[in-house]
Structure formats: structure tokens, C-alpha cells
Curated annotation (Swiss-Prot):
Key word Transit peptide present: yes
Matches recorded under Gene3D superfamilies: P-loop containing nucleotide triphosphate hydrolases
Protein name (database record): Phosphoribulokinase, chloroplastic
GO cellular component: chloroplast; cytoplasm
Plastid is among the record's keywords: yes
CDD domains: PRK
One family name in Pfam for this protein: PRK
Residue ranges of coiled coil: none
Pathway given in the UniProt record: Carbohydrate biosynthesis; Calvin cycle
PROSITE patterns: PHOSPHORIBULOKINASE
Amino acid sequence: MAVCTVYTIPTTTHLGSSFNQNNKQVFFNYKRSSSSNNTLFTTRPSYVITCSQQQTIVIGLAADSGCGKSTFMRRLTSVFGGAAEPPKGGNPDSNTLISDTTTVICLDDFHSLDRNGRKVEKVTALDPKANDFDLMYEQVKALKEGKAVDKPIYNHVSGLLDPPELIQPPKILVIEGLHPMYDARVRELLDFSIYLDISNEVKFAWKIQRDMKERGHSLESIKASIESRKPDFDAYIDPQKQHADVVIEVLPTELIPDDDEGKVLRVRMIQKEGVKFFNPVYLFDEGSTISWIPCGRKLTCSYPGIKFSYGPDTFYGNEVTVVEMDGMFDRLDELIYVESHLSNLSTKFYGEVTQQMLKHQNFPGSNNGTGFFQTIIGLKIRDLFEQLVASRSTATATAAKA
């Protein structure tokens, strides 16, 4: 769908690089007759019409820090083909990932306070006061309309706000971070939304692994960070899941009594009913309530085994469909047996979920429900993207005939 905007020439200077390869510009002069004998008129200021050739589709992914957003993004961008990489020639500490089809923006880049500023103001990064939602809304809206933006960068290494980077409008924009569904204006821009809901026990184990290994934080600082963030998480982050189209809930297993290691996970994919262009995945018989232990001749299962559940439910007053997996896969090549019993996967061919899982078998969560459901949601987003593009093309063609 083409999106057109009219500017006077004097006002276009502040747009900088917003005219890009996705835009077409038409220049013209505003003219007015200067006499009754139709003598040609005085030339007025020139104008430019900018028409984007596409409207970017926007996906929102919300979760607390250290909850697997980065891995999810790698799985998602892989579904569309091409590796997601930082902007070439840009800031080496950029949080942005770009592939042929997708651009992933980390919403930490819209922090209004750097690390020291938050200490001075005694607020966490989760507090809305530490974030610039006006700028977030303006830039996501601009990208959705096909305009490039100079997006700020929050440097996770130094804790400082770095100079901005140029972001061109992609086919699919993913905004991931703490607050993609917090501000109602930003929420309205989303075509689809996901919330990663990690239990406190699992979150602690994941955050230790990431922040100690990748960011060099001490165990004591991680514990202090979790405790200091919890009130703000409960107030500002957790409530966003009521707005999500899909919630991936990660819990300790129920297969091992009193398990406290957190190595085996129970993962629930909570899918909201009635979402346009999204048909919930189901197991065996749509609308039924099912419990299934697939271990046997076709699926190798070591202790404690694998259990699937499926059925309708309600979530924050919304009708939902829930698919649950508890346990771990021993052999990913056998996953196709499970895949064959699930419907509405939005695959292009038989075994595509299994192929994607095998392709990224070294990613965290590849042997449990986190990687399995993330892969499925990636395929569902691809299908949603294709349906949205087709519907907009149809609407444009219909409007042209009118």
C-alpha cells in the first residue's frame, strides 16, 4: 500500500534521510492566476509528495531483561531467510539487527536516561520515567509509514546514550524490549504482539547465565538487580501480557516432584482467539481438551519424559487456545512425529518446523518447548505477514478501480 505525504520544500530539510529507496517523490509548484486575462501566475513555494511503496508491518515482543528475546529474534529472522546482523559500518555496540526482510529494534534505545542518570534519579530502566515514549511512538510510526529515522542507541557496555543510527523502513519491523505494549499509541501500531512470560525461578537461572557469561556481571550484582527491578516489573512490564496476541509462558516442570534445578521446563503457548490473520495452533482435535504422552516407539524419551496438553481457556478475560509442552526432546529429528499431530502450523511443507529446529539446534531452548513454540510463532508471523501484504494489495487494487 502506498502511503503519501505532502511537504513544502522549506519544511523538508529537517527530514534529512527520510527519503529513501522505498519512496517516490513528485515535485510541483503551486500556481495562481494573477489577472482576469489568464496571464500566468506567480510561482509559489514548491511542494513534494513522498509516497512509500510499502507499509511496514510491525511486530512487538515484550519481556524482561534476560528472558530469551534475542534467541527468539534469531529464530524469527531465520524463518524469513538471511542472517540478521548489526548495521554495516555502524556503531559496533548497536542493538539493531537487520536481515533482508526484517529489522529488529531494541527498545532500550529509547531510554531517556543513561545508567548514571538512572542512579541519580533513583529509577530503573523499567520505570516509564526512564524512557522516551513520545520518540518511540514517532519513530515506530514513521517506519511503519515507510520513512527512515535517526534512532538513538543505548550502549549496554558503557551504559551511555550513543549518537543515533539511520534505520531504513523494512518489510517487517520487530520492536523488542521492556515496553512495546505499555504505551497505547505504540500498541496501536502493532500488527501482532508476543509476550515472553518467564517464571521467577526460571528467570533467575537464565539471567545468571547471560549476565555473568556475556556481560561480566557478578552473581551479587545480578541478585541485587533482580530484587531492585521486581516492583517495577510487576507494575509496568507484567501487565502488558494482557494485550499480547500470544503469550509464551515458561514454568518449572511438573514431571519431577519438587524440582529446583530448573533444567526441565513446562512451556505454555497461550493464543488469543479472534486475532485477524492468525489461526491458533491445536493438537489432534480443535476445541477438545487433550493430554498426550507421545513417548514410545516413534519418540525417544529419557527421564522424565514428555507430556503435551491442549485445550481452550480464558486469559485476562479473553478466550484463548493453549498448547503446552512439559519435558525435553532427546532427538530433534524425531520431532516430526509431534509436528505431524499439530494443525494450523502455517508451514510451507511437511516437516518445516523440524527442519528449523534442526537448523538451530545449538540455540538455547532447542530441546524444549521454548524453542519449539518460538519456531512455530515465527512461521505464524510469516503467514500473517503474507496475508497482510495480500490484503493491502487487494485493498489498493479495489480503491484504484473505484
